[in-house]
Amino acid sequence: MGSGLNDTLSRNYNGLELWEIIVIVLSAIFVVVLAISLWLTFRRKTSRSSSNLIPVSRQIPPSVPEEIKEIRVDEVSSSNGGNGYPSISEKFGDKEPEKGIKAESENGDSSRSGSFNHLEKKDGSSVSSANPLTAPSPLSGLPEFSHLGWGHWFTLRDLQMATNQFSRDNIIGDGGYGVVYRGNLVNGTPVAVKKLLNNLGQADKDFRVEVEAIGHVRHKNLVRLLGYCMEGTQRMLVYEYVNNGNLEQWLRGDNQNHEYLTWEARVKILIGTAKALAYLHEAIEPKVVHRDIKSSNILIDDKFNSKISDFGLAKLLGADKSFITTRVMGTFGYVAPEYANSGLLNEKSDVYSFGVVLLEAITGRYPVDYARPPPEVHLVEWLKMMVQQRRSEEVVDPNLETKPSTSALKRTLLTALRCVDPMSEKRPRMSQVARMLESEEYPIAREDRRRRRSQNGTTRDSDPPRNSTDTDKSEYHDLKPEGG
């Protein structure tokens, strides 16, 4: 039997004996199995080492819609091509861009809002230069690895160091959304760190809303989002720090020196706020409806420039779009009636809220104050009543040392009353509001005057000459709110 097995194994197949073929096949199988084992082992080690190199904080950030682009406030209309968006000159008047950019240059802040330099010629004219002005970035000196295209990526440790371990002494604001801390980055830049509360995933939602609303926009009157932190369940937003309180504090004398704003400072702050809202509503796509415009959300820097903050309730809307919700958000006293009653939201909701802020700045009163007599509880209704009774001079904030001129008061009152018109379609756009506040004339369109004359059956030629008393009466008549 043994000799038979030997004979079988010794048989010749293509020049090789059978036992040689068996050894070769077994060796090949062994080599293949060994190679596969080594490859799998190497792959496991590689995946482990790579996972150890990436900390928890390096998660993939939430995606930001590509349609939200960085758009400068003073971009010329030629950049719009034929897309149908109004140019800046259409929105703010033919001379406004030059005036705005020159003023910004004088303040040393033009790099933050203008894409073109305006150079003065000897003959007084100006030309545009396509080279943008640049200023040092508040993020200069920080590691570049955390730049992901839509803000700076901070680690939890970065922000712990910046805020002294989120010390209570660093708290500058809190609410249902979370807590805001003052901090200093490693390069010395002061920041405001908004730490969102993570209630049932609400932090993720609030984080996404604010990033989508303001992450890629730039305007000198919008508080700038510098970056964010995503680490574990932590969601934080890092904003520029605005160091001079907010409009509400300055209207109530709640600032450090218990001082009140002058009339000129109030108008400057209101114009800046109006231009920022016009930018959000009319210059970017999708437009941004803030939904919580109020005096405490208008921050003030050391040069008394306004900066709109807190975009936690903001809503993105396409062109000519409205949004209907069953959950009305905002602050009582500032919410537009159509939004409060039916949930209909569009940019005219912000216009109404801005009108209430205007009335606050004029009167120094709260939008709703139950400590006052019943006719004076609601600011909007009380002011309409005072205007109808031709007692406009009596509504001015008594804390103003120097009262505004009669024409300035009338102009601002009329602008405010148009903003708080109960019919949203009659409210002006924010670009119109900015023009009204800057104009030296009453914001009564010539077409409106002509229409009123035609309805009364009179013409310009047939109008009798009026003395100053008649003029004053007519102007007070113009102040009467429509539908109020």
UniProtKB/Swiss-Prot annotation:
Biased composition regions of type Polar residues, renumbered to the chain: 125-134
Superkingdom: Eukaryota
Transmembrane segments: 21-41
Family annotation (SUPFAM superfamilies): Protein kinase-like (PK-like)
Catalyses which reaction(s): L-seryl-[protein] + ATP = O-phospho-L-seryl-[protein] + ADP + H(+); L-threonyl-[protein] + ATP = O-phospho-L-threonyl-[protein] + ADP + H(+)
Positions bearing Phosphothreonine: T155, T326, T331
Annotated ranges, domain Protein kinase: 166-445
GO MF terms held by the record: ATP binding; protein serine kinase activity; protein serine/threonine kinase activity
Active-site residues, as the UniProt record annotates them: D292 (proton acceptor)
Residue ranges of the region described as Disordered: 72-135, 425-484
GO (cellular component) term, any one: plasma membrane
EC id: 2.7.11.1
PANTHER family tied to this protein: OS01G0323000 PROTEIN, PROTEIN KINASE DOMAIN-CONTAINING PROTEIN
Protein family (similarity comment): Belongs to the protein kinase superfamily. Ser/Thr protein kinase family.
Protein name (record): Probable receptor-like protein kinase At5g18500
Taxonomic source organism: Arabidopsis thaliana
